[in-house]
Amino acid sequence: MNKKELTNKYKQTIQPMGIYQIKNIKNGKIYIGSAKDMRGIINSNKFQLKHSLHSNKELQNEFNEIGEAGFSFDILDYLKSKENLNYDYTKELKLLKDMWLEKLHASSV
């Protein structure tokens, strides 16, 4: 397969979606996020934090103070797909994220 075919195949595949957490091990504070593509979200957050690019300034400040070793990055839940490439999962992800925010008394990423 050439690059264009691989790109088209990727676009025709439903990616794993769900909820993740970034936890400050030192103070126990939890940040919850959702993603339509879970495969790269942890690495994306780590990259942003390491390069002081994260949009959550409170999380960024904590990361700058204690470093990566002071945090855990975990997948909390996956959203079951409907096998429809055109379906918009935004509402379902928001509901699932809100449930985890309430359950863990956490902040949003």
Where do the language-model regions lie?
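Structure-specific nucleic-acid interaction/processing domains
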Residues: 1-32, 36-109
